Amino acid sequence: MDASTKVLVNISIPEAAERAASTGADGVGLLRIEHLILSTNKTPEKYIEDHGSKAYVEELIRGISVVADAFYPLPVRVRTLDAPTDEFRQLQGGEEEPQEHNPMLGYRGIRRSLIKFGDKFIKNSSNLTNV
């Protein structure tokens, strides 16, 4: 049984992956993919409307791959889209985002993904192992 302590890094932007990997970390404990989306300045729906779902998936794969390549063969844990509604409202296409008293506790994360995308979300999440 391995009882050693693992040191994992959190990464918000793929461009930080190489520097983070050079620290000798044992992998990525949290890759925040919402920052990949926020950097496009469009909500996922608006990005897909403008560029198509294939381009959206390719954008995510590009960012995740940069991190996965920098840390290979170490583990990379990816968090699904977790931006709060107030951050989405600031993006192109964010006009329809709900106004919430406390966006940090509201419509976000897995709740948002399952409500908006249901079974598609579950099926597509399994593709992360292919990155």
Model-derived segments and their meaning:
Residues 1-131:
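Conserved alpha/beta-domain cores
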